[in-house]
């Protein structure tokens, strides 16, 4: 049974502006493991795309979960990894059930869709 759905999109230019304003922005969004992957990318464009995708995915999860971000849920309560085929998934989350995630990018934006499913 579907518990919740969430979708979020973010313009890459908005993420780039946030990076320009604050070097700590990355650390506020990404977990230690995600930050290691981010730092391994060579190009600024790829880093921005990766960060935008993680931002959108975490925002989409917070909407599907029904709380948004605040006391009940923070960015670091969520962690995203990729399986052996490259498919992203939440490796860390507070939901007791299945979590489905899709992330897509274009030259201008990133979008993510999350479905939370209870057994």
From Swiss-Prot:
Its EC number is 2.7.8.7. It is found in: Cytoplasm. It catalyses: apo-[ACP] + CoA = holo-[ACP] + adenosine 3',5'-bisphosphate + H(+). It holds the Pfam family ACPS. Keywords: Cytoplasm, Fatty acid biosynthesis, Fatty acid metabolism, Lipid biosynthesis, Lipid metabolism, Magnesium, Metal-binding, Transferase. InterPro entries: 4-PPantetheinyl_Trfase_dom (IPR008278), 4-PPantetheinyl_Trfase_dom_sf (IPR037143), ACPS (IPR002582), Ppantetheine-prot_Trfase_dom (IPR004568). GO terms for biological process: fatty acid biosynthetic process. Mg(2+) binds at residues 8, 59. One of its GO terms (molecular function) is magnesium ion binding. Its cofactor is Mg(2+). One of its GO terms (cellular component) is cytoplasm. Transfers the 4'-phosphopantetheine moiety from coenzyme A to a Ser of acyl-carrier-protein. Belongs to the P-Pant transferase superfamily. AcpS family. This is Holo-[acyl-carrier-protein] synthase.
């Amino acid at each position: 049974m579907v518990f919740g759905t969430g979708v979020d999109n973010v313009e890459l230019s908005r993420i780039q502006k946030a990076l320009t304003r604050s070097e700590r922005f990355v650390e506020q969004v990404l977990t230690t493991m995600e930050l290691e992957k981010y730092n391994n990318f060579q190009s600024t464009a790829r880093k921005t795309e990766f960060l935008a995708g993680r931002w959108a995915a975490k925002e989409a999860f917070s909407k599907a979960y029904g709380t948004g971000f605040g006391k009940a849920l923070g960015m670091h309560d969520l962690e995203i990894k990729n399986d052996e085929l490259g498919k992203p998934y939440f490796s860390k989350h507070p939901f007791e059930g299945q979590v489905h995630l899709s992330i897509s990018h274009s030259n201008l934006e990133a979008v993510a869709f999350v479905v939370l499913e209870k057994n």
